[in-house]
Amino acid sequence: MSTSCLNLIKKLSLAIEETNDEIINNMTQNGIKYDWLCIKNNVTYDFYYKSLKNRLQLVVEEYLMSSSKQMNFDSLSLSEIEPKQFELQFDVSQNINNFIRLIHSQDNNNFIDVFVHLLSKYKAKYGESLFPNEPIKTIDFIKNFYGKFNSELNSLNCTDCSSLKQTMCTCIIEKICGLYGLSINVSDQVNGIIPEDLHSVKILFTEIIKHYYENLHPIIWAQIILGILKDIFIELPTNREEFIKFIISRIIMNSGPLIFKIIQFIKPMLSVEIAKKYDLTRLSYPMLPEKSVEIIMKKIIINPETIDIIENYSASVGHVCKVIKLDDAENPFIIKIIKPLAVTQSCWEYKILHNLFPKNTCEHDFINAMLESNGREFNILNEVSNTNKGHDLYTDNYRNVFGLDINAVITTPKNISGVIKHDCWFAFAMELAPGISLQKLIDNNSFQTDTEYRAKLHRCLDLLVYKFFYNIVKNGFFHNDLHAGNIFFSHQLSQLTLIDFGSVSEINIFSSNTDSKSVLEIIIMSIFYNYDGILDVISGIINNKCPINQIIQSKNYDDFKKKLYDYRCNNIKNSPIDNINQKIITDNIFGFNRISTEKDLFIDNHSKGTISDSIYRHIDKQYFDKEIDIINEPKKSRELEYPKKIIIENKDILSMSNENMDSNTNITFTFVLDLIMKFYSEHNINIAVRFIEFYNLQRAYCLLLGVLHKSNYSSYRLYHIISKSIMNWSNFQSLFNVKNTYYLLTVYQREKTVYNKLLKQLID
């Protein structure tokens, strides 16, 4: 009995999954050390290729044997006795070409079952909107479409097929894509995601991406093909734009960790149109299959029979399980696992990219720093250490920080001991963050009016802003990825919880390194709007970093600096009015009447039971404040805990609602930073390469500002909290050692003197 093409595709997918599981099983064996991961023979990318090759060739040979044509000796030709073999090649485009030619050579109708199955899926999803009403017309439509499909396959010529080194989508893919009117070059499409105004960044990443996809290893392209084969029957694109969006998003999200890092690197700078075009508005990553999770969990948990998984989520290089102990089912917690396959992929990425640029260049240092950063993230013990440090440095309450009688708390999840085996380097257990991610609340448009609910959130955000800057200047430590999905809010607990300390940055403020001190200097200069001075400080740093493409005094530089100086003067000139507004806002927000109103409404809501019944009336009470939102939504079959829309029904609008009376005339520091970054890019200078300490801070700050803006958080309030966290004279001695204290006091006094002098000139 012949094997259908549809079954062949399923078996090929299964072969990839089995090879993935083999790597997972080998890498998670007892005794495997983190330092061995790129060299131990049964977990390397070369081992993966050999193992995948054996499995795929067995599948194809079985197919050839089962689907052989019936022989007729009267019409026997020499071509029919030629050996038919399929040998897996390193080049993905050659494999696809050989695979389709092989199937088509067996029987011209071999693709009918796939074609009919695909059309049945389209019919079920789109109904009459896609197909004509009359049965005869529908059959004719299908026949004509298949005829076009088949003629494209008949016209294939192996000599036309270029190597992946020219383009990933060669003649075979282009012909199939031609049914949609498509021709896709992966490098061009991925490069198209990077904004043109990031000129130097685009040049750098273009070279990296081009080299990456031209040398693509089977451990990467096998995951891409698997992702496409699994999702094409679900997504069912209907036009050119949808098809491009589908293919490119599957290529990106099934590529290796470095591509994830690049996308995360540029995502804050993407336009809404580009993000939508490539399905990057909210990054979603493939989850580990349940079988793979089961393999890992049995090996890492001390008493696996006592643990039950109730939900699975995926991050970029991690997998997250929401679990319960069977003897404590009321208190779910989290087990985070590093994806073993991502580790092996990163070893290949290091091999092909670490010498891409000449040594002793900024580009060489940058790509190696990125690769090594990925490597550190794969050792979960680093995240455990960061989580512990983050908990110590970010946990605080409103009374302690601001001296006001307000119940608001900021914290992070704590690690849980006694669950994971102590020598495990790729998994750890931690508390479940209470509440709901800000991303869900923002998506639901929950912060447009000044309600008691929003007021409580803003008190918690006060703490976040304070601790973010306080920890930078005191400890040189900050969370590097504060997007809305990594921040949880519990109204019942009056608590903000930060998650995912896998990505943090540290600035050694106690060293003699001028870069670290310059970061702190720039923060102080920004308080006094010294934007042109900030340009000079950054330019001095980047000129000292690399001898090539230095920023020099020129008319362009002088003109841009004059523009920043004008912005500075504009803000200083507006400062008398701003100071009045600042006082009104801060007196309101931090005054007795406002605080009393917030407290009374909070107590009243709790006494009436309206927190769960009114604010979240549409959410099952047993799950209230128990949601987790790690990067992406769970699979559709698992979306049981929450409806897609969370409805906030708090109607307690506060009477003093001038909290967001912001100035529209001032030029913000964020806007200026964006201009400076673009100015450098236009002059072929990548600030991320030249001044990584500042770039990391700028990126983290922009992510935080994005959250604050979407939560309708006042810019006056932000300025007040930043000033309090950095320039609070009562705690200055606790912030710095003597040397740094003297340096920053000098900078502060210098900037204040210049500010006052310029203010007097502008007012007079």
Swiss-Prot record:
SUPFAM superfamilies listed in its UniProt record: Protein kinase-like (PK-like)
Looking up InterPro entries in the UniProt record yields: ABC1_dom (IPR004147), Kinase-like_dom_sf (IPR011009)
Source superkingdom = Viruses
Q: What Gene3D superfamilies does the record point to?
A: Transferase(Phosphotransferase) domain 1
Protein name, per record: Uncharacterized protein L702
